[in-house]
Amino acid sequence: MAKKSMIAKAQRKPKFQVRAYTRCRICGRPHSVYRDFGLCRVCLRKMASEGLIPGLRKASW
């Protein structure tokens, strides 16, 4: 889990627009966040395998 202070800091509007960054809505992780879902790769994989994201499933070929 991310520190509460870092999550609060990310929610504030930055002084310069290029400083804004995305965080996972579930765990607050700052890296590898999918913008379409607002989730990091770890949470996305977990929720997809549990069937909590409609239309998303694990690929197999």
UniProtKB/Swiss-Prot annotation:
<feature type="binding site">
    <location>
        <position position="27"/>
    </location>
    <ligand>
        <name>Zn(2+)</name>
    </ligand>
</feature>
<dbReference type="Pfam" id="PF00253">
    <property type="entry name" value="Ribosomal_S14"/>
</dbReference>
<comment type="subunit">
    <text>Part of the 30S ribosomal subunit. Contacts proteins S3 and S10.</text>
</comment>
<keyword id="KW-0689">Ribosomal protein</keyword>
<protein>
    <recommendedName>
        <fullName>Small ribosomal subunit protein uS14</fullName>
    </recommendedName>
</protein>
<comment type="function">
    <text>Binds 16S rRNA, required for the assembly of 30S particles and may also be responsible for determining the conformation of the 16S rRNA at the A site.</text>
</comment>
<keyword id="KW-0479">Metal-binding</keyword>
<dbReference type="GO" id="GO:0005737">
    <property type="term" value="C:cytoplasm"/>
</dbReference>
<dbReference type="InterPro" id="IPR001209">
    <property type="entry name" value="Ribosomal_uS14"/>
</dbReference>
<feature type="binding site">
    <location>
        <position position="43"/>
    </location>
    <ligand>
        <name>Zn(2+)</name>
    </ligand>
</feature>
<feature type="binding site">
    <location>
        <position position="24"/>
    </location>
    <ligand>
        <name>Zn(2+)</name>
    </ligand>
</feature>
<keyword id="KW-0694">RNA-binding</keyword>
<dbReference type="InterPro" id="IPR023053">
    <property type="entry name" value="Ribosomal_uS14_bact"/>
</dbReference>
<dbReference type="InterPro" id="IPR018271">
    <property type="entry name" value="Ribosomal_uS14_CS"/>
</dbReference>
<dbReference type="InterPro" id="IPR043140">
    <property type="entry name" value="Ribosomal_uS14_sf"/>
</dbReference>
<dbReference type="GO" id="GO:0015935">
    <property type="term" value="C:small ribosomal subunit"/>
</dbReference>
<comment type="similarity">
    <text>Belongs to the universal ribosomal protein uS14 family. Zinc-binding uS14 subfamily.</text>
</comment>
<keyword id="KW-0687">Ribonucleoprotein</keyword>
<keyword id="KW-0862">Zinc</keyword>
<keyword id="KW-0699">rRNA-binding</keyword>
<dbReference type="GO" id="GO:0003735">
    <property type="term" value="F:structural constituent of ribosome"/>
</dbReference>
<dbReference type="GO" id="GO:0006412">
    <property type="term" value="P:translation"/>
</dbReference>
<feature type="binding site">
    <location>
        <position position="40"/>
    </location>
    <ligand>
        <name>Zn(2+)</name>
    </ligand>
</feature>
<dbReference type="GO" id="GO:0019843">
    <property type="term" value="F:rRNA binding"/>
</dbReference>
<dbReference type="GO" id="GO:0008270">
    <property type="term" value="F:zinc ion binding"/>
</dbReference>
